Swiss-Prot record:
One of its GO terms (molecular function) is rRNA binding. Part of the 50S ribosomal subunit. Keywords: Ribonucleoprotein, Ribosomal protein, RNA-binding, rRNA-binding. It holds the Pfam family KOW. GO terms for biological process: translation. One of two assembly initiator proteins, it binds directly to the 5'-end of the 23S rRNA, where it nucleates assembly of the 50S subunit. One of the proteins that surrounds the polypeptide exit tunnel on the outside of the subunit. This is Large ribosomal subunit protein uL24. Belongs to the universal ribosomal protein uL24 family. InterPro entries: KOW (IPR005824), Rib_uL2_dom2 (IPR014722), Ribosomal_uL24 (IPR003256), Ribosomal_uL24_CS (IPR005825), Ribosomal_uL24_KOW (IPR041988), Translation_prot_SH3-like_sf (IPR008991). One of its GO terms (cellular component) is ribosome.
C-alpha cells in the first residue's frame, strides 16, 4: 500500500494524551505502521553515560512512536485534519487532500 503519511508532513494527533497537538513527522516505520512526530508522545528515558561518544548520563526526554491510525495529515488551508487521496498525473502518482483536491 502506498504511504499516505511521509517524513516532513505536518500531522495532527487524533487520539491519546497529545490529542489535538500538531507536529512534523520525523520518521516512519512502515513495517509496524508507526511514526515519530516532533514534540509528540514524549517519554523520559534513563540513560547511562557513554564516555566513548562523550554522552552524559541522566534522564533524557525523547519522542516515542505513535500508531499511524492515531494521526491525520494537517491541511493548513482549511486548518483541519484531512484525508489523503491519490491522483495519477503525467504518469506520476500524486498525493492530494480529499477535501480540497490540491496536491500535498
Amino acid at each position: 500500500m502506498a504511504a499516505k503519511i511521509r517524513r516532513d508532513d505536518e500531522v495532527i494527533v487524533l487520539a491519546g494524551k497529545d490529542k489535538g497537538k500538531r507536529g512534523k513527522v520525523l520518521s516512519v516505520v512502515t513495517e509496524s505502521g508507526r511514526l515519530f512526530v516532533e514534540g509528540i508522545n514524549l517519554i523520559k528515558k534513563h540513560q547511562k553515560p557513554v564516555p566513548q561518544l562523550n554522552q552524559p548520563g541522566g534522564i533524557v526526554e525523547k519522542e516515542a512512536s505513535i500508531d499511524v491510525s492515531n494521526v491525520a495529515i494537517y491541511n493548513s488551508e482549511t486548518s483541519k485534519a484531512d484525508r489523503v487521496g491519490f491522483k495519477i498525473e503525467d504518469g506520476k502518482k500524486l498525493r492530494i487532500f480529499k477535501s480540497t483536491g490540491k496536491t500535498i
